[in-house]
Amino acid sequence: MAAFVDTNILIYAFVGDIKGSTAKPATADSLIARLIQEDALIVSTQVLSEFSANAMRKGSPPLTVQQTSRLVKTFAAQTVLAVDASLVQLALQRVEQSRISYWDALIVEAAIRSGATILYTEDMHPGTRYGQLELRNPFL
């Protein structure tokens, strides 16, 4: 089953929890490893960009450019959905309909377009459905 993964899950898996918890990184790492093994990981260009920017400035120590680049190549071997103007328009409509933030709406619309049935995130309400897409928080 294909699953879209939000940026924060990748950050926990590969950078860790800047607050020092080990539970979230272990859970995120296990989830990402399973999805990659099953060839079921989906991300968007937005997720790759956010991951890259945050991975190189968060964590102790932050990831290097080379480490970040290797991880992006790993993710790119999976399914990567490009954010384009039509997706931005759909996200704007979603903001108006659902009253969620623009960035969350863009993630939701990318996940829907990708055909994913699950969106793993901790930033939105778990259990919420948008058509066939269900939001899940892997840490609950």
Question: Each predicted region: which residue ranges?
Answer:
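Active-site neighborhoods of divalent-metal-dependent phosphate/nucleic-acid chemistry enzymes
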Residues: 77-119
